[in-house]
Amino acid sequence: MERKFSDQELIRRTHLQELKNQNKNPFLITKVDRSMFLKDFAEKYKNFSKEELHNMDLEKLTLAGRLIGIRQTFGIIQDFSAKLQIYINKKNVAPEVFSTFKSLDIGDIIELEGVAMKTNSDEITLNVTNIRLVAKSLKVLPEKYHGLVDEEIKARQRYLDLIVNDETKNTFIKRSLIIREMRNWLDNKGFFEVETPVLQDILSGAAARPFITHHNTLNKEYYLRIATEIALKKCIIGGFEKVYEIGRIFRNEGMDSTHNPEFTSVELYIAYVDLWYIMQLTEDLIRHIATKLNLLNPTFRGFSIDLNKPFKKAHMVDLINEYVGVNFFEVKSDEQAIELAKKHHVKLLDHQKNFGHIVNAFFETFVEEKLVEPTFVYGHPLQVSPLTKKNQSDPRFVDRFELFICQKEFANAYSEINDPIDQYERFIAQLEEAKLGNDEASELDMEFIEALEYGMPPTGGLGIGVDRLVMLLTSNDSIRNVLLFPHMKDKTK
């Protein structure tokens, strides 16, 4: 396939060919012996004056980075740690060194040898004595003052976004620190980290449409996991009393500002605790991460949030009553619930024409958008919670909560079903829903039922969407901005 290049790209390719003709092909270089990172260089010499540096017998150091700016005999290079000014004096270097400097293009990756100096403006600078080109940039970086602002290009060409936008790089540094702090906190609380299969032969653990793949050797269809829940509960059954997994989840569903087909979640399970214990743990975990990284006051979706304030708690039915004026505690039949849905113009699919789904539909239609401050919503209906213990006071509901912040769900937690008979009946009910068109219904997982029959202690479980938490803490409104390489529609579509 013939490729077309811009005039600038052709000039750069000509420069590369000239280097090859001189036996200076930069792509043959395999190693650079750096003395230190740019940030460390600046830190080492920042407290010396211009005169002190000039009069000191300084050691020559080797630095490396990408050239991102040139102005006469000055330049700017950057590595992962920082940016640094460089300076070359034609009178003090060999002619071929100065010639190499003048032939460089913005974006080139270079090795530099030199000593520290300060300019009249007191800026730490590398006084260059030698230069070697170690990778030629054949593409032109975005122009300095306008930068890279097109969100589509930033997501498709994240490597370019990272080169030119410090804000993007800092977001992904924070993402790494958030996950690290989450892991450290759980480890320090005595949790045991495990890894469970991505390929699963039963669809369960969440309400979601799966990706399906084929195992050639076994000649068998598998799902990419939609949750880690079932496998982690098996660990609890096996005797691990505090387990967690941070890993990729795959759901074959729509894409929008808060959803990507593959995403990262943390799920954890603790034996001998209930929903209320998990609720406090969730608040403690999020606040700890935000405090540790100084991210307690993010702005998300146009709302300013204070994560240091106690999180609110409310029953789902009470919230519906508050915002809609309908008290579902007083509704005694599916027929009554259906009439209320008609009255309030709540659309229902065939499998949703029952009390539980209608309560949930009211909540999603009228209440979610009202929940700005961090709020634990508990008391979900039984029909939408097939893996959750029934509430002992009102078995139409279950011991489950979701955490909402700025109108979006961030966490989902249960007192887990440990009664294998109840769990079997719930799976059968899910099969009936599937017949009515619910393509997110769970399958009958007999292996899990048999595992439960050996006995699982009372258990509390929690799932948190890591990407969405990163969005909140870094004040990013789009999930694409916190995923290094998000899924995108084809350019031609």
From Swiss-Prot:
Q: What is its EC number?
A: 6.1.1.6
User: Record's superkingdom?
Assistant: Bacteria
Pfam families assigned: tRNA-synt_2, tRNA_anti-codon
Catalysed reactions, as listed in the record? tRNA(Lys) + L-lysine + ATP = L-lysyl-tRNA(Lys) + AMP + diphosphate
Gene3D superfamilies for this protein: Bira Bifunctional Protein, Domain 2 (3.30.930.10), Nucleic acid-binding proteins (2.40.50.140)
Residue positions binding Mg(2+) 2 = 409
Secreted as UniProt keyword: no
Q: Per the record's keyword annotation, is NAD included, yes or no?
A: no
Q: Which GO terms describe its molecular function?
A: ATP binding; lysine-tRNA ligase activity; magnesium ion binding; tRNA binding
Query: Which class of enzymes does this protein belong to?
Result: ligase
Q: Which family does it belong to?
A: Belongs to the class-II aminoacyl-tRNA synthetase family.
Q: What is this protein called?
A: Lysine--tRNA ligase
